[in-house]
Swiss-Prot record:
HAMAP family: G6P_isomerase (MF_00473)
The keyword Electron transport appears for this protein: no
GO cellular component, as recorded: cytosol
GO molecular function: carbohydrate derivative binding; glucose-6-phosphate isomerase activity; monosaccharide binding
Catalytic activity, EC: 5.3.1.9
Pathway it works in: Carbohydrate biosynthesis; gluconeogenesis; Carbohydrate degradation; glycolysis; D-glyceraldehyde 3-phosphate and glycerone phosphate from D-glucose: step 2/4
Organism the protein comes from: Helicobacter pylori (strain G27)
Reaction equations catalysed: alpha-D-glucose 6-phosphate = beta-D-fructose 6-phosphate
GO terms, biological process: gluconeogenesis; glucose 6-phosphate metabolic process; glycolytic process
Protein name from the UniProt record: Glucose-6-phosphate isomerase
Active-site residue list: 351 (proton donor), 382, 510
Gene3D superfamilies, A to Z: 1.10.1390.10, Glucose-6-phosphate isomerase like protein, domain 1 (3.40.50.10490)
Pfam families from the UniProt entry: PGI
Localization per record: Cytoplasm
Length: 545
């Protein structure tokens, strides 16, 4: 456990020594700070100089990582050891993008051979859709792709297809359905033509309630309009491992793309779950996405901790969570194409590390994953940045931006990028009472009024942030960015001694929903309901009589 590691008390003592130091003072005294706390990898760079740390902090954090045998645990993951201990599974999403020829054997299965076999089928299928060779039941080309999934079967593909829209096929329109409320699927069905639409049903077990409900609604809609169930074979494909259920649905087994238990949902966009990505972007760009992630994998596996991006980001996060007692972390992308990135990272981070039980089954006496949230940075400035600047919470921030200007939008990117740098500087430097007072007096305010108002215009600063810069929003850079955050999450899970690869927290609510659904549908359940739940069930039933 973290609190039992030999470096932990050293970090506690060090925290007491520097907790009141203002970052602005460090910058004033150290002209090399920005260049020393800057790491470049391929087309992605990290400026972590605006953090409340110094060389001693980093030295101790690296010692903490050594206390946890981080290097050995990284290797264990890549080699296919069953580090998902509660489910007795290997964790090999890295194998999905590996360009290495060294085979990984897992329970007598050749992992890379299996992965590449599925990728080959995905490439052939996506080529047939993109080229127009795969036709619908009236011999029309496919114009719309509807991905039906939820969680990891939705968020990754949605995020990547949105981020890389400039690389998408101009004929294809992408639609993503996850919510079971009925509104989302019906809204999509209103926009599309059954004769030119391909549905991708993404569910490992092909029994996920939300996904199957939406898929059956789409199936009913399609059959009513096409007039024959046999046409399903041309318009529905599945990403699943349940061949029998897929065939019962009406999907040809040749249109089923498999993935494996060693790939968790939130790590699965690199697998057949990414079929919608490959169809939209094409195999060349999908390969570039995989390559970007692979290069980050190799960096994570081989780079010394001092220049290792995932290790640095993971350890800096631990520094704030377990020593500064930060409860929250903000993801602020400054690019409209990255608008779904924060909610993708929400699942990746909080479903992985939102745990309080150690690998040994003990209750953990310290904080683990913070609340991860975010929005488009430029919009957020006009919404919740007020709290970040002048509120009472310490919330570290990841600013994410690209250097590449958008064509045909002169001046836009300069405005955007200036705001990234200005916000990071403002969070670091702040504004003192004396500075605020001087500004007000310079504007001609009455002295007494200026003294009162100046208190409200103080920015305390010393608010930490990372700046992640991509040269451009490209397939390889998005691949590297996602892999960076995957490995950051892994690092923190190792430090906290938790299993980052199960998600038992999603199960209880699903179990309790079963008898409640029976009641809502008019069937009696023998389950116990608390008085509040019972009252609300009756309220619903009475309204819908």
């Amino acid at each position: 456990m973290l609190t039992q590691l030999k470096t932990y008390p050293k970090l506690l003592k060090h925290y007491e020594e520097i907790k009141e130091v203002h970052m602005h003072d460090w910058f004033s005294k150290d002209k090399e700070r920005a260049s020393r706390y800057f790491v470049q990898f391929e087309s992605l760079s990290l400026d972590y100089s605006k953090n409340r740390l110094n060389d001693t902090t980093l030295k101790l954090l690296f010692e903490l990582a050594d206390d946890c045998s981080l290097k050995e645990k990284i290797e264990a993951m890549f080699k296919g050891e069953k580090i998902n201990t509660t489910e007795k599974r290997a964790v090999l999403h890295t194998a999905l993008r590996s360009l290495n020829d060294a085979e990984i054997l897992l329970d007598n299965m050749e992992v890379l051979k299996s992965v590449r076999s599925v990728l080959k089928r995905m490439r052939a299928f996506s080529d047939s859709v993109r080229s127009g060779k795969r036709l619908g039941y009236t011999n029309q080309v496919i114009t719309d792709i509807v991905n039906i999934g939820i969680g990891g079967s939705d968020l990754g593909a949605l995020m990547v297809c949105t981020a890389l829209k400039r690389y998408g096929h101009p004929r294809l329109k992408m639609h993503f359905v996850s919510n079971v409320d009925g509104t989302q699927i019906l809204d999509v069905l209103e926009k599309i033509n059954p004769a030119s639409t391909l549905f991708i049903v993404a569910s490992k077990t092909f029994s996920t309630q939300e996904t199957l409900t939406n898929a059956l609604t789409a199936r009913k809609w399609f059959v009513e309009r096409s007039g024959d169930e046999k046409h399903i074979a041309k318009h529905f494909v599945a990403v699943s491992t349940n061949k029998e259920a897929v065939q019962q649905f009406g999907i040809d087994e040749h249109n089923m793309f498999e993935f494996w238990d060693f790939v968790g949902g939130r790590y699965s966009l690199w697998s057949a779950i990414g079929l919608s990505i490959m169809i939209y972007l094409g195999k060349k760009n999908f390969n570039a996405l995989l390559k970007g992630a692979y290069l980050m994998d190799e960096h994570f596996r081989n780079a010394p901790f001092e220049s290792n991006l995932p290790v640095l980001m993971g350890l800096i996060g631990v520094w704030y969570i377990n020593f500064f007692q930060s409860k929250s972390h903000l993801i602020a992308p400054y690019d409209q194409y990255l608008r779904h990135f924060p909610k993708f990272i929400q699942q990746l981070d909080m479903e992985s590390n939102g745990k309080r039980i150690s690998k040994k089954g003990e209750t953990i006496p310290y904080d683990t994953c913070p609340v991860v949230w975010g929005d488009m940075g430029i919009n957020a400035q006009h919404a919740f940045f007020q709290l970040l600047h002048q509120g009472t919470h310490l919330i570290p921030i990841d600013f994410i931006a690209s250097l590449d200007k958008k064509p045909n939008a002169k001046g836009h990117h300069e405005i955007l990028f200036s705001n990234v740098l200005a916000q990071a500087q403002a969070f670091m430097k702040g504004k003192s009472y004396e500075e605020a007072l001087g500004e007000l007096l310079f504007k001609g305010l009455d002295k007494d009024e200026a003294k009162d108002l100046a208190h409200h215009r103080v920015f305390f600063g010393n608010r930490p942030s990372n700046i992640l810069l991509l040269e451009k929003i490209s397939p390889s850079n998005i691949g590297a960015l996602v892999a960076l955050y995957e490995h950051k999450v892994f690092v923190q899970g190792v430090i906290w001694d938790i299993n980052s690869f199960d998600q038992w927290g999603v199960e209880l609510g699903k179990e309790l929903a079963v008898p409640i659904l029976q009641e809502l549908e008019g069937h009696k359940s023998n389950a116990y309901f608390d008085s509040s739940t019972k009252h609300l069930i009756e309220l619903y039933k009475n309204y819908n009589q």
